[in-house]
From Swiss-Prot:
Protein name according to UniProt: ATP-dependent 6-phosphofructokinase, muscle type
Keyword terms of this UniProt record: Acetylation, Allosteric enzyme, ATP-binding, Cytoplasm, Glycolysis, Glycoprotein, Hydroxylation, Kinase, Magnesium, Metal-binding, Nucleotide-binding, Phosphoprotein, Transferase
Cofactor(s) needed by this chain: Mg(2+)
Glycosylation sites: 529
Region (Interdomain linker): 390-400
Gene for this chain: PFKM
Modification sites for N-acetylthreonine: 2
GO molecular function: 6-phosphofructokinase activity; ATP binding; fructose-6-phosphate binding; metal ion binding
UniProt region (N-terminal catalytic PFK domain 1), positions on chain: 2-389
Catalytic activity entry: beta-D-fructose 6-phosphate + ATP = beta-D-fructose 1,6-bisphosphate + ADP + H(+)
């Protein structure tokens, strides 16, 4: 750790930070405000709320109030922005900015954290560039003294992007996007059930005037027939194509059609395509019963998803650090997420690229607009086009046979992965088989061929429709080899948890004895525990996280009513503390006990003492998470008994074991989208590998790189040979030896008011957006 960073606790002494939310609200803004306030106070700085956005900055007075630790309590689970946001005309005029500068100087505030969309952030940059002129004007007119001017000689600005459209270039995800997707998907799922009853076509209009992100991801997450987005207008004969597509879907036996339209959708000539236009077209040409639903402001509402709370919190921490480390020479920056890395980017570069996209669309340079949106957006578009617009070939000549299976415990999103694997496989012209009940089913021959409609409507369904078991293959190699020959299986896609990975290792071992096992296979990590080596995320973990989070919210609410109550909640995850840690961040827990971060009786004592102190404040409730296997002796009951005894007369304790609800439920948008893209990526790899492994008329794959885990690493999806991942695995505890999320634990402790050192050595350095374009998360 570098020495200048070591003093995070004193970094803010003598400094003041103001935080404001501006422009359209977005879920997760409160999480960011809470983190800015608490981390600011932790560093020794004074933190001020600016109410009503820039308007409050201009009007001053009671709009700018000092924040306390407790004033941001219970904010985490609220949607919108608690400190208010307003569109502000005054700040656009220099006169307004002069008043704003005066209000800041008088309070000694030289650090401004702006949470909003690109308009709000551009405004902040203008304000910063004029700062010294504004000060000299104020000094000339006698509004501020020379001494005040010197004290506030420069203004630091850091932006956080809060916008449900995800329309800001340079950030993979803006605060609020994931929550907006949650709202949309809840509605799409509800509409799907009624559409199926009546065989209807639904046209859904989602927000996004200049950006089609929400529409695009929604269509991937619900398997829509068609999506209209501003960046990619349809071809000139789109009416023909759309109607043909809808009737094909119907003829395959589907009872519903879903068409997603972004509010800014246009055709190649820039003429708007409205949801009514589409409805009229379908009714006129096909005579289908068609309904339009415009989602509107529902998308901005509701509680933030777990992802947005963690994103808001992490960005808030990073923003405070960027402000306090700022000098007159550092450009105004935005803090954002790339893959799962926090990055700082020059604010104006991002604004420029964001404007370039709009200009490219205005000038009908649509290919360029798509490129500027970044690689992740383009990947979404490619997968959508494949799944929605390519017809599977009629003949299976020269095709290969690939089998898909689920292994391990059920996880939400497994079905979405199976669906995209099967459909992409069919589009490539392969024969696709599905295996029921994991390796056991492969041994018993529970295998059948899957056609296009076999997996219809699977994206939104939780659990595992194929059936899944933890059984490993080793003891049934004889039968498995026989079935590989019998069904002519030439490639295997294994979707599952830690057993899918260890099963893969066993298959590699078995190749020495059984030639039949020399076929390419790929493991797609799918488990709520997120403990598969070689991947930062696994399918199903996001859904489980949201389930835990929702439960914790309800429990906290009940505790807020009874007061002086501490809840101890046990989460799943085996030995892996991912769920407990991330849910702790997202639900605002006081502590999260996990196996990877060993704790002693002294730590438990410190936690109890901490809660005793907390009961003296206005926040009279506590939330403690415990991973199921964090310690064999300090069980949930033990911790509950300890807290009950030590808290006598000060607080009551209650315990909850969440259990299997964490494996159930409908998959979240993230898990649907992630699973869909992983399935597509796995099949593209598979068809290449099978062709490579063709020897004398049969498949023979014997190299280490023909058995891989497909994982998300930092910013890209990568294939890693299972044998190479052995070194990185702790087999006894079924977890990877290195886990990226452990470095988020200090944030959890600081936000819960513990005096600890924040290791800021892993800080994001300023990057440039052009470089980022090529290295972006390739998901």
């Amino acid at each position: 750790m570098t020495h200048e960073h070591h003093a995070a606790k004193t970094l803010g002494i003598g400094k003041a930070i103001a935080v404001l939310t501006s422009g359209g609200d977005a879920q997760g803004m409160n999480a960011a405000v809470r983190a800015v306030v608490r981390v600011g106070i932790y560093t020794g700085a004074r933190v001020f709320f600016v109410h009503e956005g820039y308007q409050g900055l201009v009007d001053g007075g009671d709009n700018i109030r000092e924040a306390t630790w407790e004033s941001v309590s219970m904010m985490l689970q609220l949607g919108g922005t608690v400190i208010g946001s307003a569109r502000c005309k005054d700040f656009r005029e220099r006169e307004g900015r002069l008043r704003a500068a005066h209000n800041l100087v008088k309070r000694g505030i030289t650090n401004l954290c702006v949470i909003g969309g690109d308009g709000s952030l551009t405004g902040a940059d203008t304000f910063r560039s004029e700062w010294s002129d504004l000060l000299s004007d104020l000094q000339k007119s006698g509004k501020i003294t020379a001494e005040e001017a010197t004290k506030s000689s420069y203004l630091n600005i850091v932006g956080l992007v809060g916008s449900i459209d995800n329309d800001f270039c340079g950030t993979d995800m803006t605060i609020g996007t994931d929550s907006a997707l949650h709202r949309i998907i809840e509605i799409v799922d509800a509409i799907t059930t009624t559409a199926q009853s009546h065989q209807r076509t639904f046209v859904l209009e989602v927000m996004g005037r200049h950006c089609g992100y929400l529409a695009l991801v929604t269509s991937l997450s619900c398997g829509a027939d068609w999506v209209f987005i501003p960046e990619c207008p349809p071809d000139d004969d789109w009416e023909e194509h759309l109607c043909r597509r809808l009737s094909e879907t119907r003829n395959r036996g589907s009872r519903l059609n879903i068409i997603i339209v972004a509010e800014g959708a246009i055709d190649k000539n820039g003429k708007p395509i409205t949801s009514e236009d589409i409805k009229n077209l379908v009714v006129k040409r096909l005579g289908y019963d068609t309904r339009v639903t415009v989602l509107g402001h529902v998308q901005r509402g509701g509680t933030p998803s777990a992802f947005d709370r963690i994103l808001g919190s992490r960005m808030g921490v990073e923003a405070v650090m960027a402000l306090l480390e700022g000098t007159p020479d550092t450009p105004a920056c935005v803090v954002s997420l790339s893959g799962n890395q926090a990055v700082r980017l020059p604010l104006m570069e991002c604004v420029q690229v964001t404007k370039d996209v709009t200009r490219a669309m205005d000038e009908r340079r649509f290919d360029e607009a798509l490129k500027l949106r970044g690689r992740s957006f383009m990947n979404n578009w490619e997968v959508y086009k494949l799944l929605a617009h390519v017809r599977p070939p009629k003949s299976k000549s020269g095709s290969h046979t690939v089998a898909v299976m689920n292994v391990g415990a059920p996880a939400a999103g497994m079905n979405a992965a199976v669906r995209s694997t099967v459909r992409i496989g069919l589009i490539q012209g392969n024969r696709m088989l599905v295996v029921h009940d994991g390796f056991e089913g492969l041994a018993k021959g529970q295998i059948e061929e899957a056609g296009w409609s076999y997996v219809g409507g699977w994206t939104g369904q939780g659990g595992s429709k194929l059936g899944t078991k933890r059984t490993l293959p080793k003891k049934s190699f004889e039968q498995i080899s026989a079935n590989i020959t019998k069904f002519n299986i030439q490639g295997l896609v294994i979707i599952g948890g830690f057993e899918a990975y260890t099963g893969g290792l066993e298959l590699m071992e078995g190749r020495k004895q059984y030639d039949e096992l020399c076929i390419p296979f790929v493991v797609i990590p799918a488990t709520v525990s997120n403990n598969v080596p070689g991947s930062d995320f696994s399918v199903g973990a996001d859904t489980a996280l949201n389930t835990i989070c929702m439960t914790c919210d309800r429990i906290k609410q009940s505790a807020a009513g009874t007061k002086r109550r501490v809840f101890i909640i046990e989460t799943m995850g085996g030995y892996c503390g991912y769920l407990a840690t991330m849910a702790g961040l997202a639900a605002g827990a006081d502590a999260a006990y996990i196996f990877e971060d060993p704790f002693t009786i002294r730590d438990l004592q410190v936690n109890v003492e901490h809660l005793v102190q907390k009961m003296k404040t206005t926040v009279k409730r506590g939330l403690v998470l415990r991973n199921e296997k964090c310690n064999e002796n300090y069980t949930t009951d033990f911790i509950f008994n300890l807290y009950s005894e030590e808290g006598k007369g000060i607080f009551d304790s209650r315990k909850n074991v969440l259990g299997h609800m964490q494996q159930g439920g409908s998959p979240t948008p993230f898990d649907r989208n992630f699973a869909t893209k992983m399935g597509a990526k796995a099949m593209n790899w598979m068809s290449g590998k099978i062709k490579e492994s063709y020897r004398n008329g049969r498949i023979f794959a014997n190299s280490p790189d023909s058995g891989c885990v497909l994982g998300m690493r930092k910013r890209a999806l990568v294939f890693q040979p299972v044998t190479e991942l052995k070194e990185q695995t702790d087999f006894e505890h079924r977890i990877p030896k290195e886990q990226w999320w452990l470095k988020l634990r200090p944030i959890l402790k600081i936000l819960a008011k513990y005096e600890i050192d924040l290791d800021t050595s892993e800080h994001a350095h300023l990057e440039h957006i052009s470089r980022k374009r090529s290295g972006e998360a390739n998901v």
